[in-house]
Amino acid sequence: MAEDHDYSQSNVPQEQRRGFWAMFVVMLGFTFFSASMWTGTTLGNGLTVSKFFLAVLLGNLILGAYTSALAYMASSTGLSVHLLARRSFGKRGSALPSAILAIPQIGWFGVGVAMCAFPIVTYLKEKGIECNIWIPVIISGILFTTSAYFGIKALTIVSLVAVPAIAIGGGFSALKVFCDNPDAWNTLKNFTPTGDNALTLSAAVALTIGSFISGGTCTPDFVRFAKDRKIAVSTTAIAFFIGNSLMFLFGAVGGMFYKTNDISNVLVAQGLLIPGIIVLTFNIWTTNDNALYTSGLGLANITGFPKKYLVLICGTLGTIFAVTLYNNFCGYLNILNTFIPPVGAILMADFFVVRRKNIKSNAVPGNGKPAILAWAIGTLVANFVQYGFKAINGMIVAFIFYVYFVKVFGGLKEAEAPAEEAPAEAAQPSNDEEAKKEEVK
């Protein structure tokens, strides 16, 4: 079997860990998400400018705290979200969260391929060039699959090119809005939402959180490559504040002045066709290759097959069904995404509460019942309780019930951790040094 450079079945060894900038561009590219621009348009049309910035700030504070906690766990262990799930759901039981995480990501990959292809066909048609939709679909699918196939190094290279391109293109476009519209700031400052568009602050914060909390659960798949906890947590927190906030801002400005929710369409409306296509492609690319990478890791945990071959299969399926997924599957994918946040809450409960005295323990419970029951209850609450923030409601309930059920059912007291089944312990010298200091004390 070929060497697994993505460590889909084990922890990332210390010598393969990466520094701040390599991790930062990957995480920033991860947060450059087109769906966040759609949410930004909704927020921009539904809030005053002061409440818009407050909602984005509060929402990203919560998202940043959640993803930073997952980043801390990943860098401490060197494990992907799927291998972290083994520690609470058990080896067989971890197939459940892996499937919940992997299947929507394959679907979103297909949607992203179509999202890239349709505007390109439209742009070319406006220039008098007829193009069959399957040409950009196939090209996009191959591009996005290739970087996911080659793993974290390829994801880093794509992000190194894409992140500056998106930031410069979006920043220039926003600046052009104010240059072309002298009263733009007054328009923003004096804007008052009316009718069905108006949002309460709590609803706006819920939208901000909901736009990325499911994707954010996959954070460990990337930051497990960070050299230490400080790099993992800081790059994650900063990326969510900068990347997510920029996407909301671009969406709000585009929606208000150009009646579109995507910065690439704004660039085209401003007469910048080629930059628009470039920004569109890069913006979707940095999200899609990450989605496919995560789905490959999830299926590798379920099947035991190498991640890179599973990425090829998932990428091929997503490309073939891209148009169908785009037209019929978005609503279904959004429903599936409500199943994901309770998984992250259970992983945190296991790491910070159940294993708090021995976070390096890779004991795999012989009985995954506590995690499965807690996930089921958290998912039901997230879907049917209408008060507060749905995703957070589900997470809080799943967290509490997991800790409770571990006490009721015995949890790790029934653990079995054969070396060939349990994920290997992460090699992190800084952790060992801390442990020695504690022993001396």
Predicted regions and their residues:
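Membrane-interface "cap" regions at the ends of multi-pass membrane proteins
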Residues: 1-50, 195-205, 224-231, 408-425
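C-terminal membrane-solvent junction of multi-pass transporters and transport-like membrane proteins
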Residues: 14-17, 344-419
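Transmembrane alpha-helical segments of multi-pass small-molecule transport proteins
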Residues: 26-30, 98-99, 113, 125-150, ...
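Membrane-water interface regions at transmembrane-helix termini and the short interhelical loops
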Residues: 42-46, 72, 96, 118-127, ...
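Juxtamembrane transmembrane-helix boundary signature
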Residues: 56-89, 98-104, 110, 407-415
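Hydrophobic transmembrane alpha-helices that form the core helical bundles
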Residues: 94-128, 285-301, 342
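Membrane-interface loop-to-helix entry segments
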Residues: 117, 135, 139-177, 236-240, ...
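Hydrophobic alpha-helical segments and their helix-loop junctions in multi-pass secondary transporters
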Residues: 148, 164-191, 204, 208-212, ...
